[in-house]
Amino acid sequence: MKNKAFTTTTELGYHDGFQMTFENGCTISVQFSKHTYSDGGETTAEVAAWDNQGNWLMFDEDKWTEIENGSDVMARQSVSDVAKLIYTLSQW
């Protein structure tokens, strides 16, 4: 079965948010409930990302790098930050 490109995380049993899997196999998760590192979606969201092998990624100093699995998320990202993260991961 092929993975869906777009998934709501409520479908997966998580908090409010969504996941996107790009043609390069990388996945980004954007969460914005009261139980995340965000302001509940008022102005910020929590973001996590994985490469096509399932390795966790962090975006820092304008580049994606692999981090220890589940060790951190990108907290309190603005709308502009989320847009940049989505675009750069889709091109990685």
Where are each of the predicted segments found?
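Catalytic phosphate/metal-binding cores of nucleic-acid and nucleotide-processing enzymes, i.e., regions
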Residues: 1-92
